[in-house]
Amino acid sequence: MVKGNWALFEEDFWSINTILQTLIHTSSSKSVMLIDKTGQLISSIGEPPGFDVTSFASLAAADFAANQQLAEMVGETDFATLVHQGTNESLYLSLIANRVILVVLFDKKTSLGLVRLKARRAGEELLSVLNKLFDKLQYKDEELSAASLGAEFAAE
């Protein structure tokens, strides 16, 4: 299930940003973003891009959605990574936990192979952080639901 609203705890925010910062340094990338599948920007690290990040996040999510349809048409369940290579600028996108998209913007000063390797490692670390976050959010939602239910019964 894709949720459009994110509750990010401070410790998780810093864990995510530390992973993204490490990815930028180890891959010599320009910028890294974490976007949810609805197109909401979760975090952005690195050089500020010369474009509207909100629009970019929406387009990246739509790109992944379109490619998922293409994957199904050719008999795949999904394409977990996408690459867009340009003459000067390139994008590497990777789906993590089937809920968020890691986007790495890099130029010709670094190689796709290096970006792919470092992004894969960062993805594994992000998966661990995100799974813990999802567990917290589910637990939090259950607490809120139980509290609300109890309050409704107490009011009668």
How would you label these PLM feature ranges?
Residues M1-S29, T38-E156:
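Acidic, low-complexity cytosolic segments
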